[in-house]
Design a protein with these regions (language model features):
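Positively charged n-region of N-terminal signal peptides that target proteins for export
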Residues: 1-4
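Bacterial N-terminal signal peptides
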Residues: 7-17
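Signal peptide processing junction and immediate N-terminal pro/mature segment
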Residues: 17-26
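Basic nucleic-acid-binding interfaces
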Residues: 25-207
Length: 207
């Protein structure tokens, strides 16, 4: 099962959008995001990361080139997952926007996955050709009172209790109760205790 890193500051105000907000219901914007092919941009970022000195571009240069002729997308929370043969090699991201647009977020989050991921062995140069990238773009984070409000195949889950918190992305579980238990365990929250729950609505981009 894939685990993800949560970079949202626990003490800050969460980005919470209702199902009727512009972030949750913008089909034209969603169509524009699909044209960005964010998963391909993530792979290009990985390839750039492993180029030798003198050929490797700075992240700002790489981002600038990727933005040419494109609408870069409104800022949203975003996760990048790198996998090999169906197994996660790195995953990083935040449920809240950390960059000005989606292209910038994809590039910098991919680089963070390569440099900051601590649960898996670091990705090596020889693995690049076998890597696949998935980019999960957060559309809404909505408070819920019951797991009945979640379809784990379509929704992610964010749980929080005091300073403990964790995220599971959409599609990581097939059963809502199991999703809640796993998310609590990941956060270090006692399974039988109450906690704040948030449904994550997101679009997932991969090949």
């Amino acid at each position: 099962m894939r685990l993800v890193s949560l970079l949202a500051a626990f003490g800050s105000i969460l980005f919470v959008a209702s199902p009727h907000s512009s972030a949750a219901a913008a089909p034209d914007a969603d169509a524009q995001v699909r044209t960005l092919k964010l998963n391909e941009l993530a792979i290009k970022t990985v390839e750039n990361h492993f180029l030798p000195d003198g050929k490797r571009k700075s992240l700002s240069q790489l981002t600038g080139e990727m933005k040419k002729g494109k609408v870069a997308g409104a800022p949203r929370g975003l996760f990048v997952t790198l996998s090999k043969a169906g197994k996660t090699r790195a995953c990083w991201g935040s449920i809240t926007p950390e960059h000005d647009d989606l292209i910038t977020a994809t590039v910098y989050t991919t680089e963070a996955a390569l440099n900051k991921e601590y649960r898996f062995a670091q990705v090596k140069r020889g693995e690049v050709k076998d890597l696949k990238a998935q980019v999960t773009v957060i559309k809404a984070v909505t408070p819920i009172d019951s797991i009945r409000a979640i379809n784990p195949l379509r929704h992610g889950l964010f749980v929080r209790q005091g300073g403990r918190a964790a995220v599971l992305l959409p599609g990581e579980c097939v059963d809502a109760h199991y999703q809640l238990v796993q998310c609590k365990l990941k956060a270090g929250i006692p399974v039988n205790s109450r906690c704040q729950m948030y449904r994550i609505t997101a679009d997932v981009y991969h090949k």
